[in-house]
Amino acid sequence: MYDLTGFQRDLLLVVAGLDEPHGLAVKEEMEEYYEKEVHHGRLYPNLDTLVEKGLIKKGERDQRTNYYTLTARGDREIADRQQWEATYLSD
């Protein structure tokens, strides 16, 4: 996960926290967090990068809608990151 941008890490966490979200649901969550519009031209290429890296999987819900799920590798990467952060953030 060290090679991801902050935006990509945030996307990964959103996908992990939602139940098979479609792109628009991910977009809405990101906009709520960032408090500004997230354009499709930023969102979908970064989701595709996470798919290419094997951190999330893209499935097809219907002909127009894709959904995203966390892979086992994505889950491990998040757990490793949380453990690393805890090393520096623990009391």
Feature-to-residue mapping (PLM):
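A cross-family signal for key residues in well-ordered alpha-helices
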Residues: 13, 28, 79
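Amphipathic alpha-helical dimerization/coiled-coil segments
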Residues: 81-91
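Basic amphipathic alpha-helical segments that dock to polyanions
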Residues: 43-53
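Basic, amphipathic "hinge/linker" alpha-helix immediately C-terminal to the N-terminal HTH DNA-binding motif
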Residues: 63-82
